């Protein structure tokens, strides 16, 4: 039936849409041909929704956008693609991919936002510990899950991303990492059950016990094996407040040693949130000292820095959860007991107390500012990597202190994670050596007035960093990976490539799903 719509919607403009209407072919008819209850958008309307992403460096023309009512509509779109010779299907959450991963040129894009409210139910796992969970739609935004869980049940998911304007299915298809991951692992380690539409068009419930191969394939699977329509996410009691702290270091070795000590402690012997970032040793308002203070009344005093410090500095970012019923003295003692072990620069400590939900939504204000000044709509050539503890010192000396010593016009995150909190049965790949590895995120923002050449230079610098890693044998993996050839993907997955290929053969043998990742080509 998909052949029915192709002749009428190959041209992505109003003229083609008018011609189709004149011929008596409407989008209602297309919906019927796909056997779905939801809406179909074609032509310019489809391109407006699914032709660009947050990265802003790719622009493609999908054949149509499917706005499903539920999983059966998604399965219908996949089955229609299977009946065609060349159509592909991509799931699009909130469009936050960087390199076109959620796009389908000439294919069908499934707009998961229309399913956001299909599931929301809190329950408890069977067993003695009464662990709470919430069933949510794959198209739900994490910020909405947070607000509803806390306001209605006093509960919250355990593991987060920094920015919560992302869909549940989107982050679970990658990993989902923030400052809680050292304790609970990524978001992929905090789900117990999924509903998935596979590349065969099947709607399948899966877990560690039931259809386990699909379950672990989809988690971190880059959308290659199925589209997540429901996830069962583990919950815990939500705290009321967070003590948010930043402390500054001049020496990378001391910064990393303190961070590694914190993430290696047992729950009550550490903070609840541990992250870190690099910033420029200067007054640049976007890249330098002003990015560190947490409150308008705070001021970064550069006279506290030794004259010997280098071009970049380092900041540990910490969070401690507490209840309204906890006394200030109790919280202060817990903080001082932990802070007292750290070797940051005296006088460069900043802290505020704020509600738990506000802390988790802290990036929301940055989003609002970026939308006001236009940088939310400009390209975002971001680079995210996992780097082993063994090589993070070399990475600092070459990348932080040389290649990006003037900043990237956005945050430069670096903080440790623990291998033991990640499940190697999932499709996520991390560095090969050691218990501790680091996430590095160069989150570049482009000024609205910037020339195309400046974006190209940023992309070239990202490539230079990756090439340096390869040339020097750095134990690294791209997070939110983007490659253009299968040879690069084979190198990325290493000895897990054969498992990845086998899983593809099981759950999407025609390579229908997620063509924007550029891992497999559509099979006839």
From Swiss-Prot:
Q: Name one GO biological process term.
A: cytokinin catabolic process
Superkingdom per UniProt: Eukaryota
Q: Which residues carry this modification: Pros-8alpha-FAD histidine?
A: 96
> Got a GO cellular component term for this one?
cytosol
**Record keywords:** Cytoplasm, FAD, Flavoprotein, Oxidoreductase
Tell me the compartments it is located in: Cytoplasm, Cytosol
The EC number(s) this enzyme carries: 1.5.99.12
> One of this protein's Pfam families, by short name?
FAD_binding_4
Query: Gene3D superfamilies recorded for this chain?
Result: 3.30.465.10, FAD-linked oxidases, C-terminal domain, Uridine Diphospho-n-acetylenolpyruvylglucosamine Reductase, domain 2
Q: Which reaction does it catalyse?
A: N(6)-dimethylallyladenine + A + H2O = 3-methyl-2-butenal + adenine + AH2
Record-annotated FAD-binding PCMH-type domain positions: 58-238
* Function description: Catalyzes the oxidation of cytokinins, a family of N(6)-substituted adenine derivatives that are plant hormones, where the substituent is an isopentenyl group. Catalyzes in vitro the oxidation of various types of cytokinin nucleotides that are known as direct products of cytokinin biosynthesis.
Tell me which family the UniProt entry assigns to this protein. Answer: Belongs to the oxygen-dependent FAD-linked oxidoreductase family.
Additional comments on file? Plants over-expressing CKX7 have reduced cytokinin content, and seedling primary root does not develop lateral roots. Plants over-expressing CKX7 show reduced leaf size, plant height and number of flowers, and increased number of lateral branches.
Specify the protein name: Cytokinin dehydrogenase 7
């Amino acid at each position: 039936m998909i052949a029915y719509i192709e002749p009428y919607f190959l041209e992505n403009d109003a003229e083609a849409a008018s011609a189709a209407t004149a011929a008596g072919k409407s989008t209602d008819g297309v919906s019927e041909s796909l056997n779905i209850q939801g809406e179909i958008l074609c032509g310019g309307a489809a391109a407006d929704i699914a032709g660009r992403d947050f990265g802003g460096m790719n622009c493609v023309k999908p054949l149509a956008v499917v706005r499903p009512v539920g999983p059966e509509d998604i399965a219908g779109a996949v089955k229609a693609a299977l009946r065609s010779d060349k159509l592909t299907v991509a799931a699009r959450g909130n469009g936050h991919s960087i390199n076109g991963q959620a796009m389908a040129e000439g294919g069908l894009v499934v707009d998961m936002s229309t399913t956001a409210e299909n599931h929301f139910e809190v329950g408890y796992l069977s067993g003695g510990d009464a662990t709470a969970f919430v069933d949510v739609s794959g198209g739900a935004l994490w910020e909405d899950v947070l607000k509803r869980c806390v306001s209605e049940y006093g509960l919250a998911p355990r593991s987060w991303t920094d920015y919560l304007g992302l869909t549940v299915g989107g982050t679970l298809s990658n990993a989902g990492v923030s400052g809680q991951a050292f304790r609970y692992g990524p978001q992929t380690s905090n789900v117990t059950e999924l509903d998935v539409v596979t590349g065969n068009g099947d709607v399948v419930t899966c877990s560690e016990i039931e259809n386990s191969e699909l379950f672990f394939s989809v988690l971190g699977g880059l959308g290659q094996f199925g589209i997540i329509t429901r996830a069962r996410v583990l919950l815990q009691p939500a705290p009321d407040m967070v003590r948010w702290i930043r402390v500054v270091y001049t020496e990378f070795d001391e910064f990393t040693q303190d961070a590694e000590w914190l993430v290696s402690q047992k729950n009550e012997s550490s903070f609840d949130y541990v992250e870190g970032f690099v910033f420029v040793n200067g007054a640049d308002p976007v890249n330098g000292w002003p990015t560190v203070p947490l409150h308008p009344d705070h001021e970064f005093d550069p006279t506290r820095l030794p004259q010997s410090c280098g071009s970049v500095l380092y900041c540990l970012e910490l969070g401690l959860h507490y209840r309204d019923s906890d006394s200030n003295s109790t919280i202060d003692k817990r903080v001082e007991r932990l802070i007292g072990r750290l070797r940051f620069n005296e006088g460069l400590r900043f802290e505020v107390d704020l509600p738990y939900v506000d802390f988790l939504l802290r990036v929301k204000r940055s989003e609002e500012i970026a939308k006001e000044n236009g940088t939310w709509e400009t390209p975002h050539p971001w680079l995210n990597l996992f780097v082993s503890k063994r090589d993070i010192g070399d990475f600092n000396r070459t990348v932080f202190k040389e290649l990006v010593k003037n900043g990237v016009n956005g945050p430069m995150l670096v903080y440790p994670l623990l291998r033991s909190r990640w499940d190697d049965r999932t499709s996520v790949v991390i560095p090969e050596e050691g218990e501790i590895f680091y996430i590095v995120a160069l989150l570049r923002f482009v000024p609205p007035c910037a020339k195309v050449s400046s974006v190209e230079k940023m992309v070239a610098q990202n490539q230079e960093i990756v090439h340096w890693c390869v040339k020097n044998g750095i134990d690294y993996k791209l997070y939110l990976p983007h490659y253009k050839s299968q040879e690069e993907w084979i190198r990325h997955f290493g000895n897990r490539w054969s498992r990845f290929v086998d899983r593809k053969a099981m759950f999407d043998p025609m390579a229908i799903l997620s063509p924007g990742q550029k891992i497999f080509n559509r099979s006839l």
